[in-house]
């Protein structure tokens, strides 16, 4: 073995030692450069593999939505109903790079939603009174709209559009709401299951310590005050035996589900993103609650004060029983606002007085659409379309069927890329609402 110290001593004063040192430095430099190139090429290759995996995951989603093709052996794709929308998960792997994408999708509305009004009832023509303003075409069983005098006051509003006669039995769309009912059944059956105790927690502090995707069960009614420091994991499912009341200024998190067996009340300035909020008997949102949410219930739903459900929200009720003497299944009161769709899909009574109603008060605003197999009582504003079996309002001592008084419907003000829940059409045109990469 070469003894560098011996060589250095023997060659002291000569140029050999200098050459050896320079050679060593050059060798080290070359090693560092080659090592850097190797590391760099490794990272570049990882980026290339990751990009390929990302592209394949995106391609799987596209093929699933628009061509119905199954993924090849390199990846997997699954879909589940998430309220009225569809949640899709796509996973692929290229070498060591694995990518999972999750998307939330709705659908573009059918052409019937391009009408300001689609009136299913053909027993009487539509009458407009007071200051009612309608901007857009009207589809009904008649090609005439009555501009009516009401208690001596002539019609002073406007109708900009055409009244088009349609066979409303065929033209008025059906809504396939079974998937929503299956989701409600799944949550309802949980309360009867013997395994529910495995998911039991006692209070809000235990909920905050849970993990993403957990299911949590509360055996008693709950009253929570949520603030900005309250951490709620995403994708959790919370089921409460009895009533659930939530107030404060906190955030309920993304993709969370809250289900109360009896009643659910949310107040304060609570927020949420793509949440599902559900109740068995009655649901109320009040104060300055502002959330992107799907409200799903077999009971009555009431929005009050300055509640704002941001796009693309949905409010759905399928109740067939009265709560007291109130026939409103969905009621937008005060200055509440919904950007999305109100849905009541159940056709119940054959007589006018037996119909369940969606009611929008004078200062309330809907940007989107109403789909209602019952009656619509409209005093507020709809920037979008109203698809309803009947219109209704009452002014003592008379009930007025298929009259609209002092309301506004303007299809031109609806959001341009407006979507509706899945279930209105067999030939769906999907729209991606949210897109995220899942970190594993």
Region annotations inferred by a language model:
Residues 82-86, 91-232, 237, 247-252, ...:
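Short, ordered "entry" segments at domain starts
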């Amino acid at each position: 073995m070469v003894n560098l110290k011996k060589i250095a001593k023997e060659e002291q004063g000569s140029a050999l030692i200098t050459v050896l040192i320079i050679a060593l430095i050059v060798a080290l430099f070359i090693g560092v450069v080659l090592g850097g190139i190797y590391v760099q090429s490794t990272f570049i290759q990882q980026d290339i593999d990751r990009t390929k995996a990302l592209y394949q995951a995106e391609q799987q989603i596209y093929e699933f939505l628009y061509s119905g093709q199954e993924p090849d052996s390199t990846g997997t794709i699954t879909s589940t109903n998430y309220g009225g929308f569809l949640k899709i998960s796509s996973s692929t792997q290229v070498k060591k790079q694995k990518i999972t994408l999750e998307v939330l999708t709705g659908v573009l509305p059918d052409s019937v939603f391009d009408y300001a009004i689609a009136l299913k009832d053909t027993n009487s023509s539509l009458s407009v009174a007071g200051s009612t303003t309608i901007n857009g075409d009207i589809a009904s069983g008649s090609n005439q709209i009555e501009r009516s005098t009401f208690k001596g006051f002539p019609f002073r509003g406007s109708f900009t559009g055409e009244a088009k006669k349609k066979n409303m039995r065929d033209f008025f769309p059906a809504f396939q709401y079974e998937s929503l009912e299956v989701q409600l059944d799944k949550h309802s059956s949980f309360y009867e299951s013997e395994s529910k105790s495995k998911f039991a927690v006692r209070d809000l502090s235990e909920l905050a310590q849970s993990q993403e995707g957990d299911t949590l069960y509360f055996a008693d009614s709950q009253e929570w005050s949520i603030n900005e420091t309250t951490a709620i994991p995403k994708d959790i499912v919370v089921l409460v035996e009895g009533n659930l009341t939530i107030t404060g200024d906190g955030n309920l998190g993304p993709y969370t589900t809250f289900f109360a067996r009896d009643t659910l009340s949310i107040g304060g300035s609570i927020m949420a993103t793509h949440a599902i909020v559900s109740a068995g008997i009655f649901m109320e949102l009040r104060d300055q609650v502002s959330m992107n949410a799907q409200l799903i219930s077999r009971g009555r739903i009431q929005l009050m004060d300055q509640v704002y459900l941001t796009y693309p929200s949905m409010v759905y009720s399928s109740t067939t029983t009265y709560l007291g003497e109130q026939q409103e299944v969905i009621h937008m009161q005060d200055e509440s606002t919904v950007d999305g769709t109100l849905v009541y899909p159940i056709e119940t009574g054959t007589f006018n007085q037996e119909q369940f109603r969606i009611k929008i008060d004078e200062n309330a605003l809907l940007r989107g659409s109403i789909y209602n197999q019952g009656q619509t009582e409209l005093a507020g504003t709809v920037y979008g379309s109203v698809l309803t079996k009947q219109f209704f309002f009452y002014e003592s001592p008379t009930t007025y069927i298929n009259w609209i008084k002092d309301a506004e419907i303007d299809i031109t003000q609806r959001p341009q890329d407006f979507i509706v829940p899945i279930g209105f059409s067999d030939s769906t045109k999907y729209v991606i609402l949210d897109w995220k990469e899942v970190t594993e």
